[in-house]
Swiss-Prot record:
The chain crosses the membrane at residues 26-43. The keyword Transmembrane applies. This is Probable glucuronosyltransferase Os03g0287800. Its EC number is 2.4.-.-. Glycans are attached at residues 78, 165, 257, 287. Residues 44-415 are lumenal. It is found in: Golgi apparatus membrane. Keywords: Cell wall biogenesis/degradation, Glycoprotein, Glycosyltransferase, Golgi apparatus, Membrane, Signal-anchor, Transferase, Transmembrane, Transmembrane helix. One of its GO terms (molecular function) is galactosylgalactosylxylosylprotein 3-beta-glucuronosyltransferase activity. Residues 1-25 are cytoplasmic. Its main location: Golgi. Belongs to the glycosyltransferase 43 family. It holds the Pfam family Glyco_transf_43.
Length: 415
């Protein structure tokens, strides 16, 4: 019996040993599976690797991808074109910021045209590739209407205002616009808005290629500008005289007068007397870093505060002093890409005086005030550009007297 007991104890120990071996194998197998799964999760997808490798190699995989895109229809083709354009933009690198400064007028005659002109400029700027910042400056009383308009443009903008008051005479002399430009440049300098600054008036017309040329400016850029005066039937072209993209001087010519001489001046032409005293702000652009250049304050003595503290005059002066830093736009300056439209100050003053007279006459006729004003605005747009001042006053008199009391309100001896 003792021997049988001994055999039974040996068999139990054998079963326990085999059971522990099974547990060890299962634990080892589970550990290996866990480790393999853990590291496999960090590995990239093999399918995406094969696809990208085939496309990049330009082999069979690439041809299959192209055929499938052409077979899916127009929508896929349009998306592929957009992707190609985006890829081209990425390859070209980040583009410099364009800061477009637009000034307005606070005079009564300009209030009704401001919204239409701002809308026109907004449509133009929306065609320019980003990044672009539109800086609009205007007097404080006109803020609300313009703010609503700017919010609907879809452009990145900054709306600047000021509380300074300017008379009609100051506005006609350009003092208000000059102040607005300094307000804009002060904002750019204060916030260090790095980019290329362009002054664009509400009546200006630009070639869209012009904005691509602006992004190539490193310090200063200048271009020929055609100024069209509708009232004087006159077209004057002014701008840099270039050799390739280098500026050698400045020229001015009257295209409406075939016998008018071409004035050319500058260091490259040996005619310093013809060098303009001051550049038109619509004829150049500059890198905004010039505004916070430390050399700015040491360039001019304190006896000339306009050149050191007046930002607009400072930039105008620097452009004229150093031609080597000015880039001609386009190359050879052989094309007019910016056009300005002006109205003579004499006719503007006459129009304002006539409006003041009409407003006095309409004080007792408030019910027809809006009708008469609409007729006057229509007259201004249609006849004003081709009308002499004396004739304009007579036309306004005739229209106003006719629409108030059938022509009997004013004396016919006025004209």
């Amino acid at each position: 019996m003792g021997s049988s007991t001994d055999h039974g104890g040996a068999g139990g120990r054998g079963k326990k040993g085999s059971g522990s071996q099974l547990w060890k194998k299962a634990l080892l197998h589970s550990s290996l599976c866990f480790v393999m799964g853990f590291f496999t999760g960090f590995a990239p997808s093999s399918v995406s690797d094969w696809t990208s490798a085939a496309v990049s190699a330009g082999g069979v995989g690439s041809s299959h991808v192209v055929r499938s895109l052409h077979a899916t229809g127009g929508a896929a083709v349009n998306r592929s074109l957009l992707a190609q354009a985006a890829a081209g933009a990425v390859d070209a690198g980040p583009q410099p910021l364009l800061v477009v400064v637009t000034t307005t007028e606070s005079t009564p005659s300009a209030a009704g045209q401001r919204a239409a002109a701002l809308t026109r400029m907004a449509h133009t700027l929306r065609l320019v590739p980003p990044p672009l910042l539109w800086v609009v400056v205007e007097a404080n009383p006109d803020v609300a209407a313009t703010a609503r308009l700017l919010r609907t443009t879809g452009l990145m903008y900054r709306h600047l205002t000021y509380k300074d008051n300017f008379t009609v005479a100051d506005a006609a002399a350009g003092k208000e616009r000059h102040h607005q430009r300094n307000v804009a440049l002060g904002h750019i300098e204060h916030h260090r808005l790095a980019g290329v600054v362009l002054f664009a008036g509400l009546g200006d017309t630009f070639d869209l290629r012009f904005f691509d040329q602006l992004r190539q400016i490193r310090t200063f850029g200048a271009w020929p500008v055609a100024t069209m005066s509708q009232n004087e039937r006159k077209v004057v072209v002014q701008g840099p005289a270039c050799s390739s993209s280098s500026v050698a001087g400045w020229f001015s010519m009257d295209l409406s007068n075939a016998t008018s001489p071409v004035a050319v001046g500058g260091a490259g032409y040996g005619a310093a007397a013809a060098r303009p005293r001051e550049l038109d702000v619509h004829g150049f652009a500059f890198n905004s870093s010039v505004l916070w250049d430390p050399e700015r304050w040491g360039r001019y003595p304190t006896s000339e505060p306009d050149k050191s503290q007046d930002s607009v005059k400072f930039v105008q002066q620097v452009v004229l002093e150093d031609y080597s830093k000015v880039r001609g736009i386009p190359s050879d300056c052989s094309e007019v890409m910016a056009k300005l439209r002006t109205v003579s100050q004499q006719l503007e003053a006459t129009w304002r005086s006539a409006l003041a007279i009409i407003n006095e006459l309409l004080r007792a006729c408030a019910s027809v005030h809006g009708h008469v004003r609409s007729k006057l605005d229509s007259l201004y747009r249609s006849d004003f550009p081709q009308t002499e001042p004396e004739t304009l006053i007579c036309l306004i008199h005739d229209h106003a007297s006719h629409y108030i009391y059938g022509g009997r309100f004013l004396s016919g001896d006025f004209c």
